[in-house]
Amino acid sequence: MMGTMTMQTASPTRTARSAVPLDPALRSLRCEVARWALATGHPLNLDAIGVILAARHHEAIVEGRPFNRWTTNTVLTFLFGTAEEWCTRQHVTMPSHLGESLLTYVTFLAELDVLASGSSSIRQLQNTISDLAGLTATGHRRPARSNDVAVAPTPLRRGTE
């Protein structure tokens, strides 16, 4: 008798907007950031800002730090750790445009003068996020250049024949 093989697949991920549980204060903040971004022409992805707010809220509680304190180090760990780990735990698809949305969010906080004490300067935050996420000075992704091609490594020594 032949055995049957069962396959387990990971549970499907959901978009952040359909799955991210934001309390009323965070929902209100998401709306305020979205209105500000629209009015000022800054890029913002609603799934990304939902993840930013929810993951940062969780991180602030766990670490016992102010929600609005952003440093160049927290930006790095957020973009390459916290957000992805939070999305995985919540079974939420990692949103595109996370870097652009984070840049818009910290700029929003700076414009309202609500970055917490101990935060890096807004210029440092903007430069760090732009560098890490590959963004232009206006906060958009750098366009791919048509002459960008994969470069094959050149061997250091030729084999003897």
Set out the residue ranges of the language-model regions:
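Basic/polar, acidic-poor N-terminal "presequence/leader" segments
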Residues: M1-C31
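Acidic, proline/glycine-rich low-complexity IDRs
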Residues: M1-M5, S117-E161
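N-terminal core-binding DNA-recognition domain of tyrosine recombinases/integrases
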Residues: R14-T15, C31-A137
